[in-house]
Structure formats: structure tokens, C-alpha cells
């Protein structure tokens, strides 16, 4: 009886794992270029500047803002790590790899442990913003931009720019951090 149960369990678990990992592959026939940091239109860059409340001419780190323009609107996907779907820590990992040529660990809490904490008067563009959302550990991370704005991956709206002065972010804000 136990042997029969183990065989049935193995078959059920095996088919469940196969079903969870199957992907349908479709190709775009629209002729559009895939979203990348290198083919960002100037109108998207202007939109990012507008969201930050700055003029395009005030954008100095062009690689950073090209990355933001390309990834803006990417859907949230827990465990996702590419432009088709990402979570907050992987957005930050990709941004740091592509813009700053730095490697980061996979979780927001591990990232925070690699940083020196900063006061709001010391924070600069590219520093990380950490949140403890109903937890004792850091559970959310974003990257500081300008004018109290930061980029992050929202579970509901995907990759977006938010304001640190919004009540939700004020409530859960933990600290700013700069890589040691």
C-alpha cells in the first residue's frame, strides 16, 4: 500500500511540476523592436523627465534614464527578472548591472545589508530606497531619482515612478542606502 501511494504521489507531483513550468512561445509579427535600453524614443525620455518634474536637459545620467524609459510599465511578476515581468529586487539588480556595472544580491533585505544607511539630506540619484512593509525585514526596494521620486516595481502597477511623500511610502519607509 505504501509503495502504491509513493508511486501515485510521484506521478502527481511530476505532472504538477511539468505543468507549472511549461511556457507557450509566441513570436511577435507586428514588426516592433523589442523594448531595450538602446532603442528608447526621445518622447519616452521626455515623459520620464515630466514624471520627475525636471527638464530633459537636467537629465545627466542618460544610461539611467534610458533604462527607466525602457522598463517603465513592465508588469510585476513575483520572481520575474526581465523586461517581460519583474519584481522590485530584480528591477534594482538589472538597473545596477546595466547602469552602474554593479552586482547585487537577489533580495531587498540582502541589498540593504550591503549598503551604508543615509539620511534624506545625503541621498543622491542612484541610491537605494528601502521599505519594511508589515515586516521586521526589508521587503521592498527602489532606486532614488530626483525630487523625492524613485523607480520601483509595484505589485499592482508594475514598474513605475512614485513619490516618497505619498502616505503609503511614508508609512513603510525604512532608510536610504548607498553601496559600501
Model feature map: region roles:
Residues 16-19:
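C-terminal motif of bacterial Sec signal peptides marking the signal peptidase cleavage site
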Residues 21-24:
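Bacterial signal peptide processing site
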Residues 51-55, 74-125:
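Catalytic cysteine-centered active-site loop
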Residues 37-84:
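Post-signal-peptide N-terminal segment of Sec-exported extracytoplasmic proteins
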Residues 56, 102-166:
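...with weaker cross-activation on analogous glycine-rich loops/strands in unrelated enzymes
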Residues 1-8:
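Bacterial N-terminal signal peptides that target proteins for export
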Residues 167-180:
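Glycine- and charge-enriched low-complexity intrinsically disordered segments
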Amino acid at each position: 500500500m505504501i509503495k502504491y501511494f509513493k508511486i501515485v504521489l510521484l506521478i502527481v507531483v511530476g505532472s504538477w511540476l511539468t505543468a507549472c513550468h511549461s511556457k507557450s512561445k509566441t513570436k511577435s509579427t507586428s514588426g516592433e523592436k523589442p523594448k531595450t535600453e538602446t532603442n528608447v524614443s526621445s518622447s519616452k525620455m521626455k515623459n520620464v523627465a515630466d514624471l520627475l518634474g525636471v527638464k530633459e536637459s537636467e537629465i545627466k545620467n542618460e544610461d539611467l534614464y534610458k533604462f527607466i524609459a525602457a522598463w517603465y510599465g513592465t508588469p510585476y511578476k513575483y520572481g520575474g527578472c526581465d523586461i517581460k515581468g519583474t519584481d522590485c529586487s530584480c528591477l534594482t539588480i538589472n538597473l545596477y548591472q546595466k547602469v552602474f556595472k554593479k552586482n547585487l544580491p537577489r533580495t531587498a533585505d540582502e541589498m540593504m545589508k550591503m549598503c551604508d544607511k543615509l539620511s534624506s539630506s545625503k541621498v543622491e540619484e542612484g541610491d537605494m530606497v528601502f521599505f519594511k512593509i508589515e515586516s521586521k525585514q526589508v521587503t521592498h526596494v527602489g532606486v532614488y531619482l530626483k525630487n523625492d521620486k524613485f523607480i520601483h516595481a509595484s505589485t499592482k502597477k508594475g514598474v513605475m515612478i512614485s513619490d516618497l511623500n505619498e502616505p503609503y511610502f511614508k508609512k513603510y519607509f525604512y532608510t536610504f542606502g548607498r553601496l559600501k
